[in-house]
Amino acid sequence: MDSDTSPNPFASSPPSSPSPRPSLPPPVPRKPSSLVSAASGSPPPTHRASFPDPARHPKMGATVPGPKPKTGYCCSIDKDISAGEQVHIVDALKTTEGGTASYITYVIRLGTHTVRRRYSAFLSLHQSLTGLYPVLIIPPIPSKQSLTDYAVKGQSKAREDATIIARRKRLLEDFLQRLIRHPILGGEHVLHRFLEEDVSWSEVLHSPPISLLSKNPLHAPSHNPTFQPTTPTSPSEAPATTSYIAHHLLPTPSPSHPLRQPDQRFMDSEAFTEKFQSHFSGTMEKVNRRVTKRWGERAHDMSELGGIWNGFSLVEQGKLGDAIEKVGRAVDAEYLATAALLQSWEKTTTEPLHIYSQFATLIRARLSFRHQKHVQYELVQEALETQRDKLEILENAEREARRLEEALERGGSVLASPQLEPEAARDERERAQRRARASQGFGLLSAVKHSLSGMIDMDPEATRRANIAKTRDNISQLEDSYQAAAQDLKYASMTLQADLDRFQRQKVADLREMAINLSQVHRDWCKQNLEAWKAAQAAVREIDPHPNRPAQTQTQVQSQQSHAGPSTLHAQTEDDVSKLGVDAMKNEIERVEIEIADKPLPKPSLAETGGDGVVPSPQPRQENDTEEREGHGPLGPL
């Protein structure tokens, strides 16, 4: 197998290498869902999957409650989606409602519900769903017009371009269809409000849950980004506030920060997604643009050629003129069929390729978010270990100080300190090494700071005890943050892997459908051209045959048509035609020779025999003939 070919990591498989996992109990198993792929064309799910809470038994009961599982339909839109209603964008209208400048609104229809939304509403819906579900793959929407379009066409013309509007209608409809088919996104009430008539979308954006989203998704729970603390009125509400603070104390790592113990499954997923994006964006889309460009140039040339043939048909008369006109019509029909081919090609091939290029970018963003959650977990874990080592050193120092103080009080009877056990010595060396790694790069500054604090500190015992209390508080906060990071990492890994599996099934079905549609487009193009050229062939056969070639009899033509099918008849080569002409000429020559052999030879006349009945032999031709001397050829003067 080629070394560049790697197995698909999106498929569910056991991890090839262990990864750091929080010490949490396994999640409560759920009943198998009857959900299907968004691209399979099967009926929608009969029930919605719940948004799971990954922490069933968290530390000290401190947890972030997740959204409650749905037990029924939240609105009529949800009921229609579950019943299998399809969403369509039926029209695009130009309007000036709510302002002086005109803009385009898209008419959305779902069952009996009809609503109008502009492009900015679709964009805000995509952004809102991305914030509400940071570890789910949100379908892409078409991008805005480029600055080149505005510069070339102008702002108003670019917005009202019929081609751009038609393309946006198709892509926005695909976006909505993928949303309602998603097992979790299809049950989101924000989407239902978007599809509901007489609902102000601006009010939806400024009301919960969208208004509760954190500015930084890394500081919010992955399974409930809209979680907000409440003023604790009872001891049972205090853990929720503690968890909220723990999430906001998490660090904000860079997406390129390396991991000490990466998860091999997601490393494979990142590598596969990078190849996937490079293949679609850098190879398939580029080749597809080049092919469609050449088809467009060919269609333009065929339109010019058809005009030339039609103009030539006006010069000729009779059967030849009719045949030339039919050939011109066939060329025009091929031009029209090619134009229709390009339109269908854009719908069935170009747009799906672009959608999956956008999907690759979105998946990389989701994998990057999960990577940052993993980095958060490792950073908090390392900081917690450092603080625990620091606390142990401070406590040992405190115990040693108390022992010395007790020894001094007893009159110095015990001055020698006991030797450390070998195991304790090893632990001390390991802690020293971890402290050295943690403070690497700040050695000189730490030494100076320690010396100054030792000279200035007038009460080292009180300072040491204050440091112990402060370190214990830091450890308590880090333990809460560690628990929150562990929950987020576990939920992000499980949910993202499940959505990657769903996306892989959807991708296979979509690529299969794209290949079938492309073959059907070419088949229709061939059918249209075949009919047009058949009509031209019939007109050409009505023309009289070439005078230097014997015409075929009707019996021969019928015999050839009966023995040869339509494909064989149209694929007949010039060699076959010339062979038939040579055979006919041979038959004609044999017939003439037979007729000549049957006729008697004529008797010579007296003038030819010279009166004696003997035919004189022909005289040899003189080399210096008079005509040749005068420069005349055998056909006359040169």
UniProtKB/Swiss-Prot annotation:
Biased composition, Basic and acidic residues: where in the chain? 423-432, 585-601
Keyword Transport appears in the UniProt entry: yes
Q: Where does a 1,2-diacyl-sn-glycero-3-phospho-(1D-myo-inositol-3-phosphate) bind?
A: 118, 120, 144, 168
Record field: compositional bias (Pro residues): 15-30
Membrane topology field: Peripheral membrane protein
What GO terms are given for molecular function? phosphatidylinositol binding
Query: Signal peptide span per the entry?
Result: none
Q: Where is this region: Disordered?
A: 1-69, 215-239, 408-432, 545-638
Spell out the Low complexity composition-biased ranges. 1-14, 225-239, 552-562
CDD domains recorded? BAR_Atg20p, PX_SNX41_42
**GO BP term, example:** protein transport
Keyword annotations: Autophagy, Endosome, Lipid-binding, Membrane, Protein transport, Transport
Q: Which GO terms describe its cellular component?
A: cytosol; endosome membrane
SMART domains to which the protein is assigned, alphabetical: PX (SM00312)
InterPro entries recorded: AH/BAR_dom_sf (IPR027267), PX_dom (IPR001683), PX_dom_sf (IPR036871), PX_Snx41/Atg20 (IPR044106), Sorting_Nexin_Autophagy (IPR051079)
Q: Residues in domain PX? A: 84-201
Where's it found, cell-wise? Endosome membrane; Endomembrane system
Asked if the record carries the keyword Amino-acid biosynthesis, the reply is: no
Q: Belongs to which family?
A: Belongs to the sorting nexin family.
**This protein's domain notes:** The PX domain binds phosphatidylinositol 3-phosphate which is necessary for peripheral membrane localization to the perivacuolar punctate structures.
Name the PANTHER family on file.
Answer: SORTING NEXIN-41
User: What is the role of this chain?
Assistant: May be required for cytoplasm to vacuole transport (Cvt) and pexophagy.
Protein name in UniProt: Sorting nexin-41
Origin species: Cryptococcus neoformans var. neoformans serotype D (strain B-3501A)
Q: Which gene encodes it?
A: SNX41
